[in-house]
């Protein structure tokens, strides 16, 4: 069937299909709470068998054989996408870099950990142009090793091997990145409605003088880092330096790492802009089926090799773009540079009066040479005073530069992989790095009878059910499944900065920690504070469940260590501070975003589903764990009893709900007009949202008392063990 015939036919599905252009619920009701971020990545989208373990599969992989195949690929140029100077290293490094470079510290999202570069929007971002070709070049290797090697791991490994093949001694490589199977729904990339929109356009990510919206790190929609031509495409290295500094800081990089990564990334490979951007076809997501997932295809010629167009800039940064050397700093610091336009019309910097021997051999004709080029960000490494000092040192000490870069590259490509306990493979570095949030291992075991005895001592310590539960929750709730930071393991709630966070109620926290420390000191057997905190929560929940008439044992696995202040980078933990916690009915202040939206975001980071979120909220309310002891949402007369009262009263039509202030409501008896309870938006949303109400009704039913307790315990245990990667 040709396109003409297809366009004339009517939809064969009665009333139309909802796979493409039909309106969905969010189109009709844009203010409705969208729970999709809690429903992504479920087993229905995962083609792997239910018992498949990527960890086990990767551990059976012959990594040396994979690396040998990658080494061979680097110089095996293909006619359909020829390698620059016969080496794919620059392309593979850019692919790996752009996979890892979407990471941002504010929420831990982005990064290389899921293979998300295969999906929209990343696969079609302007800054990722022609990386579809890099992944197609890797397909024979992925096909060969199958499920033992994820795309996420292969992409980073390819970048590592590319550097090694060009002479760099890398710091190491760890596997363990499991693939996802559809685009992520939880990542906010910005609110702009067009690619590469200038910062003064509507829906800009900038406010004030040039304040970049959190949690974003990139300066434009569709870019990984900064605009290579300058701020909003206007060359000015000093202004660009500020963009670079903010962007890399939001990726957890300091100035030295920033200079090293910029220089090391541009020591090899080249920019492509020897043509017109308007000659390129759509990005992969916008192409037709015959393109088979490829995009940016040249409509007026092959558009490959020396005629390729990617960023629009044209040229290499160094004289020898297929070898690791110090040529970047040699050229940058020894020549004066002037602004020029590339053949595609992009701004770039070129050297003045360059020596013939310092020019770059043409990709297409070895008899020709061209000027090297620098982006505005490269010029920032020379013009900005602090970056200049670092550049000078790297230039004078190439070995130091190589070491700093290798470590920074490892950090860039492993930052979102989590602690070292998640690392897989024979090339994992032995050195503990502070950005990995190290936790000491424990050397004790607890048998069942000892755990029972400890629970009794915790319940007899004078601490209340709410104090024990709230402390365990506060310790564990920092976990982020995005970059696997935070959690109860390490008991960093006792250390700065967590011990002083207002969300942790420092005065109450210190009271609890003092009691737990005294209990720890009295024990004949060593037990970590981290384990005691979690066990205290378990003991309290068992007591509350028993009071509700349900006998249950909360699962507990000892083995958590206690981190020290020397193991803790205080500054890096600042971003984990909770500014809201729906589970404890707390907001640090009023925000533009509605509390229920923030609840979804936090729940998604913790790895919770919608029904797990629901049952935890209901349980935490009746246990009396609200921040500061407030009574909002505590729909029960039996505080401290793990009952389903929250849901019973929420769904009871004997009550009406009236707003009495910002994020505050009264629950009023319809017959008498008496105020029975107070509530917040995150309480009432479980009765107002149609999906959440369905879950609330399940737990409000007369036959749900035991189910509620069992489901609460299961969800609680999931949160407490979220960072126990040793149990995987």
Curated annotation (Swiss-Prot):
Cofactor note: Binds 1 heme b (iron(II)-protoporphyrin IX) group per dimer.
Active site location: 98 (proton acceptor)
UniProt keyword Metal-binding present: yes
Annotated GO biological process: cellular response to hydrogen peroxide; hydrogen peroxide catabolic process
Binding annotation for heme b: 266
Signal peptide: 1-22
Cofactor(s) for this UniProt protein: heme b
Molecular function terms, GO-annotated: catalase activity; heme binding; metal ion binding
PANTHER family recorded: CATALASE-PEROXIDASE, HYDROPEROXIDASE I, BIFUNCTIONAL CATALASE-PEROXIDASE
Protein name per UniProt: Catalase-peroxidase 1
Originating species: Shewanella oneidensis (strain ATCC 700550 / JCM 31522 / CIP 106686 / LMG 19005 / NCIMB 14063 / MR-1)
């Amino acid at each position: 069937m040709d396109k003409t015939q297809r366009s004339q036919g009517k939809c064969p599905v009665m009333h139309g299909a909802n796979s493409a252009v039909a309106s969905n619920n969010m189109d009709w009701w844009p203010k409705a709470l969208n729970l999709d971020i809690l429903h992504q990545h479920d087993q229905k989208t995962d083609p792997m068998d239910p018992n498949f373990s990527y960890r086990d599969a990767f551990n059976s992989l012959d990594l040396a054989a994979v690396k040998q195949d990658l080494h061979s690929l680097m110089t095996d140029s293909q006619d359909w996408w020829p390698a620059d100077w016969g080496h794919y290293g620059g392309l593979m490094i850019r692919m790996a870099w752009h996979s890892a470079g979407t990471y941002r510290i504010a929420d831990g999202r982005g990064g290389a950990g899921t293979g998300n570069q295969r999906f929209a929007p990343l696969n079609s971002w302007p800054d990722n142009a022609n990386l579809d070709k890099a992944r197609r070049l890797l397909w024979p290797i992925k096909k060969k090793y199958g499920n033992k090697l994820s795309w996420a791991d292969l992409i980073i490994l390819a970048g590592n091997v590319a550097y090694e093949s060009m002479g760099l001694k890398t710091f190491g490589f760890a596997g363990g990145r499991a693939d996802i199977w559809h685009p992520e729904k939880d990542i906010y990339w910005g609110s702009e409605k067009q690619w590469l929109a200038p910062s003064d356009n509507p829906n800009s990510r900038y406010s004030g003088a040039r304040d970049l919206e959190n949690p974003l790190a990139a300066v434009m929609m569709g870019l990984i880092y900064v605009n290579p031509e300058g701020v909003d495409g206007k060359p000015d290295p000093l202004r660009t330096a500020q963009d670079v500094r903010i962007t890399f800081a939001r990726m957890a990089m300091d100035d030295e790492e920033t200079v090293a990564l910029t220089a090391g990334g541009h020591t090899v490979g080249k920019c492509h802009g020897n043509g017109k951007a308007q000659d390129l076809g759509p990005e992969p997501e916008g192409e037709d089926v015959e393109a088979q997932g490829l995009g940016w295809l040249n409509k007026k010629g092959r558009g490959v090799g020396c005629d390729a167009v990617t960023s629009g800039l044209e040229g290499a940064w160094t004289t020898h773009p297929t070898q690791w050397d110090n040529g970047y700093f040699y050229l940058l610091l020894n020549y004066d540079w002037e602004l020029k336009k590339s053949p595609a019309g992009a701004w770039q910097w070129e050297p003045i009066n360059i020596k013939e021997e310092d020019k770059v051999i043409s990709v297409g004709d070895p008899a020709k040479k061209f000027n090297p080029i620098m982006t505005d960000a490269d010029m920032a490494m020379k013009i900005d005073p602090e970056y200049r000092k670092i550049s000078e040192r790297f230039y004078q000490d190439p070995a130091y530069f190589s070491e700093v870069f290798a470590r920074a590259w490892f950090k860039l490509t492993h930052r979102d992989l989590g602690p070292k306990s998640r690392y897989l493979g024979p090339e994992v570095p032995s050195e503990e790095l502070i950005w990995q949030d190290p936790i000491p291992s424990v050397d004790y075991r607890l048998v069942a009878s000892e755990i029972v005895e400890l629970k009794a001592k915790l319940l007899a310590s004078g601490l209340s059910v709410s104090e024990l539960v709230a402390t365990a929750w506060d310790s564990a709730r920092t976990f982020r499944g995005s970059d696997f930071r935070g959690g109860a393991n390490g008991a960093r709630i006792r250390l700065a900065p967590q011990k002083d966070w207002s969300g942790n109620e420092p005065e109450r926290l210190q009271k609890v920690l003092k009691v737990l420390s005294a209990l720890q000191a009295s024990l004949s057997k060593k037990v970590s504070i981290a384990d005691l905190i979690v066990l205290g929560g378990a003991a309290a929940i068992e007591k509350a469940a028993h009071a509700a008439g349900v006998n249950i044992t909360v699962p507990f696995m000892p083995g958590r260590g206690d981190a020290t202040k020397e193991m803790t980078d205080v500054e890096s933990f600042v971003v984990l501070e909770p500014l809201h916690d729906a589970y404890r009915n707390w907001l640090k202040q009023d925000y533009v975003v509605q509390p229920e939206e923030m609840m979804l975001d936090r729940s998604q980071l913790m790895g919770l589903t919608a029904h797990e979120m629901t049952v935890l909220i209901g349980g935490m309310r009746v246990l009396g764990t609200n921040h500061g002891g407030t009574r909002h949402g505590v729909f029960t007369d039996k505080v401290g009893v793990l009952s389903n009262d929250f849901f019973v009263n929420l769904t009871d039509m004997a009550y009406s709900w009236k707003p009495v202030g910002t994020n505050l409501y009264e629950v009023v008896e319809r017959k008498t007009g008496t105020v029975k309870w107070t509530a917040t938006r995150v309480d009432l949303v479980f009765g107002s949202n149609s999906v959440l109400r369905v879950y609330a009704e399940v737990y409000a039913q007369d036959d749900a008392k035991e189910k509620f307790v069992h489901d609460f315990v299961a969800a609680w245990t999931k949160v407490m063990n979220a960072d126990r990667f040793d149990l995987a």
